[in-house]
Amino acid sequence: MNKKIIFLIIALTVTFSNKGLSFERGVCAHFDSYSEDPVVYLKALKQIGASSIRVDYQWNKIERTKGKYVVSRPLVKTDAAINQSSLYGLNNLLILDYGNSLYDNGGYPTTRDGINAFANYTKWVVKKNKGKIKYYEVWNEWKNGTGMPPAMKNTGTAKGYFEIVKRVSHIIKENDPNAIILAGSFNPLTDSDNAWFYELIELGILDYIDGISIHPYSYKNENIQLRTAEANLNAIDQFYDKLTNIANRKTAIYITEIGIPNYDGIGGVNEIESSIFRKKYIKLASERSYIKGVWWYDLKDDGTNKSFNEHNFGIFKANMTLKKNTDENLSLKN
């Protein structure tokens, strides 16, 4: 074989291998709630050194009439961001999530009709976006009831979640074999969340996913030490060791949400402190071979009320001004 061809094959192998093994420095974003064109935010993400974006692609914004699938107005900007992200060196993590008022009264899809409908929505999304999505995360915080009607927040069971993951896993692999499937989105620093996921392991969830997604928020934790980057990740190490023993296998971990707000309430910190925490957390996480990425929550503040935590998680302020950073902590880059 020609030496040049051999060299090219080796070079391509190394390139794609590195891409597959690279540690993601991601950011959660809500493009459809932002005032500007998605390009403004994609450029900002590139500026701070992000390698991935994590976005919702809600079922109820795709299927508004039974059996008909359309990117409705509330998802237009998110869809545009997905289509343009590669121009800014960003991999897409897409969340398949939340209920639909057309099925199961808008609650968790647990009936046969609801599960079939969620599966059909998944198939449409995956076929439409084939080759554009590196990661699919099945639901967001099922156990917590995030995004669900208040009356249904505590009705999601481990068995119900398992059935959804099992069903859509086959659909994703059939229609986009290269996509990485993630599931979980729970907090491994809480006993109840861990018990819930251990039940999922017993049900066999690891046979249907490529990685476990976790949301190890700790800024409000009663154990003050766990609010530090070092202790947070040490606790995740302990969780991973127990997980590996229970499952009798090693499974990749993806931290698809972690953040700390600049607000006046419990666990809130100033902008410099959050920047230092973020820098340290990402660095320490990247040094653990079993952790494949961190997605910071989130890109920009959702509001300006300093008493409300949910308004103050952004790397940028609500007006897209970069928050205060020490020089060495300007971005997500290490």
Question: What spans do the regions from the language model cover?
Answer:
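Positively charged n-region of N-terminal signal peptides that target proteins for export
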Residues: 1-5
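Bacterial N-terminal signal peptides
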Residues: 7-15
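Boundary at the C-terminal end of the N-terminal hydrophobic targeting segment
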Residues: 20-22
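Hydrophobic faces of well-ordered beta-strands that scaffold small-molecule active sites
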Residues: 25-29, 51-55, 90-96, 134-138, ...
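Active-site cleft segment of glycoside hydrolase catalytic domains centered on the general acid/base Glu
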Residues: 34-36, 65-68, 73-77, 102-211, ...
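Catalytic domains of carbohydrate-active enzymes, especially glycoside hydrolases
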Residues: 37-61, 84, 88-93
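A structural motif corresponding to the C-terminal end of an alpha-helix
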Residues: 81-91, 128-133, 167-179, 208, ...
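Substrate-binding cleft of secreted/luminal carbohydrate-active enzymes
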Residues: 252-333
